[in-house]
Each structure stands twice: as C-alpha cells, then as structure tokens.
Amino acid sequence: MAKLTVKDVDLKGKKVLVRVDFNVPLKDGVITNDNRITAALPTIKYIIEQGGRAILFSHLGRVKEEADKAGKSLAPVAADLAAKLGQDVVFPGVTRGAELEAAINALEDGQVLLVENTRYEDVDGKKESKNDPELGKYWASLGDGIFVNDAFGTAHRAHASNVGISANVEKAVAGFLLENEIAYIQEAVETPERPFVAILGGSKVSDKIGVIENLLEKADKVLIGGGMTYTFYKAQGIEIGNSLVEEDKLDVAKALLEKANGKLILPVDSKEANAFAGYTEVRDTEGEAVSEGFLGLDIGPKSIAKFDEALTGAKTVVWNGPMGVFENPDFQAGTIGVMDAIVKQPGVKSIIGGGDSAAAAINLGRADKFSWISTGGGASMELLEGKVLPGLAALTEK
C-alpha cells in the first residue's frame, strides 16, 4: 500500500485524531457483538504506547432526527473499550463545543478520549454524511495535524469524519486494521496465488453486478449461490417456482453467463420449501428446476459436492454472501458445506468479505479457520469491484 501508515509518523505528545469503526449492534443498551471494537485495539494501543493522545471518532447506526439519538450514544462503547484497554476512556458525550475542547486539551500522553456518535451531526443538514467542509475543518482543528483512519467499514464513504478531516491535516495515515484489510482484499484480487476462486451469494444480482464482472476477469472460477441463483436460472428458462427473482435483471444475468466462458458455476440443485416462513414441507430438488408452489432457500447436496470439487486445490478464495437462509437451521447446510470446503484446502488464503458471510462464519463456528474476515461489507464489495475507496484515496502518499 503506497500510503503512509501509523508507523510512519511521530506520535509522542501529539493529539492524534483516529477514525475507528465502532458501529456495533446494541440491544437495550448492551453490545451484542464487540468484534469491531476488538479489531481497533492494535492501532489504539500502538498510539498510546508511543505516547500519543488518542481522540477517537465513530458513528453508530443512523441518526436522522433528534429522536433517533436515544439508544445511539457511544456511552456503552466507551465503557467496553475502557475494560478492554484496562484504562479510563474520557467520554464527554458531545460532538463539538467548549466541553469537548476542554476535555481534549486536558488529555495527557497515553490517554484516550471518545467523541460522541459522529452521526449526531446528521440531525442538522446531514453534516457528517454529506462531508460538510466546516465540520471536517473543525474536527481536524482538535488535533495536532495527524489523522489515523482505521475504519475500513466506512472507507467507501466520503464523510466529514474521514475524508473531511483528512483534507485538513498535515498527515492522514492508515491504521493497522485498514492496512490489513487493503492488503488482504486487494492482494487477493490483484495478485492472487492461483487457482483463485471467488464465491458470491446473497439474494440480489443487482448488488453484485460490478463484483461479478470484475471477478470474471480476475478469478479462475466464480461460484454463485444464494437467492441470486434463481435470476440466473430464469434467464436460462429454468423453472424457479416462487423463488426470489429480479425480473429487471434477467438480461444482465444472461449477458454475464455469455461473457463468462464457463467460469461462472451455478448450483445444480436446491433445498426447496413450500413457504418462506411457516412452511410445512422441505425437500431437495431433483435438478435445477424448483417445483411449482415452492421456493429455493439454499443450495442442495449435489451443489455442495460440485462446489467442493470446484474448490479443490484453490490457493486463494474470496467469499461474499451466504448460500442460503443460513439463519434457519433447515437452510444452512449449503453455507456450512461451502465454508468447510474452503478451509480444508491446504495452504489456502481464505478471505470473507464482511457482512452476512462474516456473521455466518461467526455464528456457525468457522470464523477462526479463515485467513481474514473483513470488518466492512460495503467497502470490501467496492474493493472487489475494483473501485477506488474515498477514505483510502484521501490518505497521504508515502
């Protein structure tokens, strides 16, 4: 990566602004998954060990109006972070103003402060999400000219708390998490050890058109599963029953199949049910066709075997999107089968592109078997598409 990283700058005695991704799920004010906080620890610890004063920025959920602020405070995150670091985290509970400035100016070397949810600034004219130049300038003024971006999850967005601050500091650098994310995903796509197999699931073809197009050029094989299978089926005239389909994407699916030259591998059977919820019958289809009155909710056993074979000997695998409705035990065999087929390959570099696939690996107990699990669904998708991420582009060149 030809950008400066946190190791390239002198941090001692400096007020260091850090964009982290603490957008964690909360239930009744309790954090239900703290992965993103844990992922940010190496960068935060490095800054304070070097004698820097870490000033952290993050968003949490969406905040459009005053009423949305309830339940979207970063207070529970500050408490969780303090426990993980084993030291106090200063939390003024505001995003700007005299109270925040005083708290920052009172920091000593090695201390940590967390600014309140940056999206609180969206209540008045979406200042954070629309990268209001004055807000970026103000937040940049709170530090000593160094900004560390460690929030891969928002790197595909141009917000005041990443691109806005970057534009107003002397040095904008990458944190360890951002550096690793880029290294794993970009390297996998641009300079993979071959054979390179990509696996794409999820419900919509429309979400993945750019990714499929880019990966058809880069990968040796592209395996398709999940709900988008049925748009590809219908494009070929295969019966899909009541399965999910994007009628307006049939031509796109047809064009992708023609362009693929056999690289695109589709499931050969499905697990079908007579309803999405409250079904009374679940069975495997004979072949590709889904029965009338039924809908496909997972890939079937023949497809799992076919994908297992397609993955044999793979050295690089990028996976984005589950094979079926994995949250339901009746329809998780496809996702489990594909995960197991990936991780059993000797010496494979296996990467999960965030989002639902990451949740599937964690919930189904396979997370520790993968080389890398991305913290950013949307950002990793854009990297897989070959796009330039604004949050990354805004960093200082080496």
Swiss-Prot record:
Substrate binds at D21, F22, N23, R36, H59, L60, G61, R62, R119, R157. It is found in: Cytoplasm. It catalyses: (2R)-3-phosphoglycerate + ATP = (2R)-3-phospho-glyceroyl phosphate + ADP. This is Phosphoglycerate kinase. Belongs to the phosphoglycerate kinase family. The lineage of its organism: Bacteria, Bacillati, Bacillota, Bacilli, Lactobacillales. Pathway: Carbohydrate degradation; glycolysis; pyruvate from D-glyceraldehyde 3-phosphate: step 2/5. PANTHER family: PHOSPHOGLYCERATE KINASE (PTHR11406), PHOSPHOGLYCERATE KINASE 1, CHLOROPLASTIC-RELATED (PTHR11406:SF23). It comes from the Bacteria. The gene is pgk. Its EC number is 2.7.2.3. GO terms for biological process: gluconeogenesis; glycolytic process. It holds the Pfam family PGK. Monomer. GO terms for cellular component: cytosol. SUPFAM superfamilies: Phosphoglycerate kinase (SSF53748). PROSITE patterns: PGLYCERATE_KINASE. Keywords: ATP-binding, Cytoplasm, Glycolysis, Kinase, Nucleotide-binding, Transferase. GO terms for molecular function: ADP binding; ATP binding; phosphoglycerate kinase activity. Coiled coil: none annotated. ATP binds at K208, G296, E327, G354, G355, D356, S357.
